[in-house]
Amino acid sequence: MPEFIWRSVLILQASTAIYTAGPAFWGLVNSAWNLCTIGKRQSPININTSQIIFDPFLPPLRLTMEGKKVSGTMINTGRHVIFRLDKQNPVNISGGPLLYNHRLEEIMLHFGSENGIGSEHFMNKESAAGEVQLIHYNQDLYNNVSEASRNPNGLAIISLFINVADNSNPFLNRMLNRETITRISFRNEANFIQDLSIEELYPESFGFLTYQGSMTIPPCYETVTWIIIDRPLNITSMQMHSLRLLSQNQPSQIFQSMSDNFRPVQPLFHRGLRGNLDFRKPGRKCKGANYKLHVDRLMSSKNLD
């Protein structure tokens, strides 16, 4: 099995036709995907803020990096835009609800054909224009993301909503500028990008909520700790338009936009939602609302100036 199950639309050797049949059919067309249909801890979900339990003991998130910048490859998979980090400067996340260190493997973008849809998670039954998902695997217990995805406490996904505005988040601005995005217009095209700062994806201060869920693509393993950041990332309307011009197909095939690449929300059932601030009282400033990302740098000789 390939090391990284997120890397291809042809997950578990499924054909593109089967995958694109739609999320409602995933559990029916492939027995290996039955959790997509019968699972009780599926993602994404609608987040009802009145159901979030305030947990003042949730610690801040902690980012551990080797060096100041990262590099990686931006890829049009035919289904998603992903940024896959190289292995030279690993980035780990810990803290919050996480009991282990998790290594950042890749960043995935979801977006809609209109600004009123696009995110996978909903907040009080409202969608955002898109969602950025930072996908990490438990490096303390597992050797790679493929192994981790199948096992308990395997994955941690940090999610940030996308908002269309007049300005753009610096990290996303590098990913979505015209020179970069036009190089991945069609399926399987890729472009190498270097000198990006992961810290720029996180707001200066923020709150978060967390719950136990699943991957949002087949085989929908229920091994994910989700961490949803409460403050969105901005991109411009032109950058969103450029995303919608990305094709699911190759140049010789009929154009089909990659937009609306999100899974519908799934039932919450009896799962609990926790947050480091009281989402039920948006006007009240509590300790969690001022959390900042803690960053530790592990400088190696190759990163010294």
Question: Model-derived features: where do they sit?
Answer:
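Alpha-carbonic anhydrase
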Residues: M1-D305
